[in-house]
Design a protein with these regions (language model features):
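Residue-level signal for inorganic ion chemistry
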Residues: 16-17, 60, 86, 125, ...
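Glycine- and acidic-residue-rich catalytic/RNA-contacting loop of pseudouridine synthases
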Residues: 21-34, 70, 87-135, 151, ...
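Short hydrophobic/aromatic beta-strand micro-patches
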Residues: 61-63, 87-89, 140
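Short, solvent-exposed secondary-structure boundary/capping segments
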Residues: 133-139, 204
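Pseudouridine synthases involved in rRNA/tRNA modification
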Residues: 1-3, 7, 11, 18-22, ...
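A short alpha->loop->secondary-structure connector
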Residues: 31-32, 75-82
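Glycine/acidic-rich beta-strand-loop module
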Residues: 42-77
Length: 227
């Protein structure tokens, strides 16, 4: 397997991880970090954050131990701005705003959102209609909890399309994509965005393929609001 490298720096790279690929070593598989190291022809790369197996999109891998410590700290201290895209078929309780609450383990490897806010998962979002019974969510997680966005979407009454663990409709993939990362790296402003891998339809997903032009228009509109 060859991974798409969307950004390369002397200290780190950013790949576009396909959905269905675990960042951890599965029992029968070679781990993602080993595969990327082999692709680059280097002894090792370092994982500094994680994406769920079902999530596609931007994943940073450090190329040396010092960079790994720096980037891991930035993620831990919420110094890296993240933007995710999700699709859902069910109408949300609200169309934009903030989802906040503590997260507790539930059954079958799932998590649930609680009303308490001692150490809350925080996600800001806006949404736009793409078609009847299909809605785009642009999400800005302010924390980095396990399954945070998937749980937030379920709490809105709009589980992610394809995310059966949280009640989403069956689809060809889970429609959650890590679209953009923005951060300062020793005075260098790094901002990276990447679409799903359109050249491989199975990895991208049919709905991202069909509606990407409309999705890009909404992303452009949201970016203009922040300027």
């Amino acid at each position: 397997m060859t991974f798409q490298i969307v950004f390369q720096h002397p200290d780190f790279i950013v790949i576009n991880k396909p959905n269905g690929i675990s960042v951890h070593k599965d029992d029968a598989d070679v781990g993602l970090t080993r595969l990327v190291a082999q692709q680059l022809g280097v002894p090792q790369v370092w994982l500094v954050h994680r994406l769920d197996k079902v999530t596609s999109g931007l994943l940073i891998l450090a190329l040396n131990e010092k960079a790994a410590m720096t980037l891991s700290r930035k993620f831990a201290e919420h110094q890296i701005q993240k933007t995710y895209l999700a699709l859902a078929t069910q109408k949300p309780k609200k169309k934009q705003g903030r989802i906040s609450g503590d997260m507790l383990k539930a059954r079958r490897g799932a998590w649930k959102l609680c009303q308490s806010k001692e150490n809350p998962a925080i996600t800001d979002f806006v949404s736009h209609s793409l078609a009847p019974n299909l809605r785009l969510f642009i999400l800005y997680p302010k924390t980095g909890k396990t399954h945070q966005i998937r749980v937030a979407m379920k709490s809105l009454g709009s589980p992610i399309l394809g995310d059966e663990l949280y009640g989403g409709e069956v689809a060809d993939r889970t429609y959650l994509h890590a679209y953009q990362l923005s951060f300062d790296y020793f005075g260098e402003v790094v901002q990276i965005s990447s679409s799903p891998e359109f050249q491989e339809r199975q990895k991208c997903g049919d709905f991202f393929q069909r509606f990407w032009h409309d999705i890009e228009k909404h992303l452009h509109s949201e970016n203009e609001k922040t300027l």
